[in-house]
Amino acid sequence: MNEFSFSVPQNITVGKGSLTKLPEIAKKSGGSHAFLMSGPHLAKMGLVEKAANSLKSAGISVDTFTDIEGNPSVETVDKATAAFKEAGADFIVAFGGGSPMDVAKAVGVTAKYGGSITEYEGAHKVPGPIIPLIAIPTTAGTGSEVTAFSVITDHSRDYKLTVFSYEILPAYAILDAELLTTAPASVAAACGIDAFIHAEEAYISTAASPFSDAMAEKAMSLIGKNIRRFVANRGDIEAAESMLVGSLFAGIAFSFAKTWKCTCNEPSGQCIL
């Protein structure tokens, strides 16, 4: 057996309706002013407002930034960083799929340490802990709530850059299966395939370890048994929760097994389909 090491220094809450614990978790982070980051689709559905109101009801100030596209760009990170600084917030809530979480991680770096996110491309270039980050996934796909990666599109190079550092791991993650129920079938399918491939790639990686293998095996089991059921009925909370936990385990597995990434400007799972 090759030498390996691992650390999962996060606080993860899993459960139906666990979004209600956001104010409690926010206070644990030590923050009093949230910068809530999401995408326009969730904003239109009223879910961003719901999350913001839960924080406000606990006496926490909130500013929102919802101008985040799929496969987010360096320019979006720059805009979000400027908005964060202008708001005067002291912690970040990433609410959505992989794109808001990737941008939130990047903003956690650039708002604290300055410069462009391009300056942190590569491995272990983030000098220290980022601004406190709470990640709340609304898809079972990227597992970004537990990964040490942020993937951002650099249009000047027509390239997706990757920041890899354990410093950008969200301090807290909330996994509420009820948030998955509004996803269209096509999105649920693509995200589920993305998560399964994360686990599969981690399992066959030359950098795999007994730890990442255990995570990958459980992820493939949960996703394989539940993806068809969930895509057919997104209101099936039991299947949704299994997919969400499978995605979580897959994210941990591929974060530690250091697998490949898709570089085309399309959802990864959709490319595989």
Regions found by a protein language model. Give the residues of each.
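Glycine/threonine-rich beta-strand-loop-alpha-helix active-site module
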Residues: 75-175
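An N-terminal, well-structured beta->alpha segment
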Residues: 1-65
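Short glycine-rich or small-residue beta-strand-to-loop segments that form or flank ligand, phosphate
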Residues: 34-39, 63-66, 92-95, 134, ...
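Carboxylate- and glycine-rich phosphate/diphosphate-binding segment that chelates Mg2+/Mn2+
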Residues: 149-257
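N-terminal small/polar loop signature for handling phosphorylated ligands or for N-terminal nucleophile
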Residues: 43-115, 229-240
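C-terminal catalytic subdomain
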Residues: 257-273
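N-terminal beta-alpha supersecondary unit
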Residues: 37-46, 70-71, 206, 213
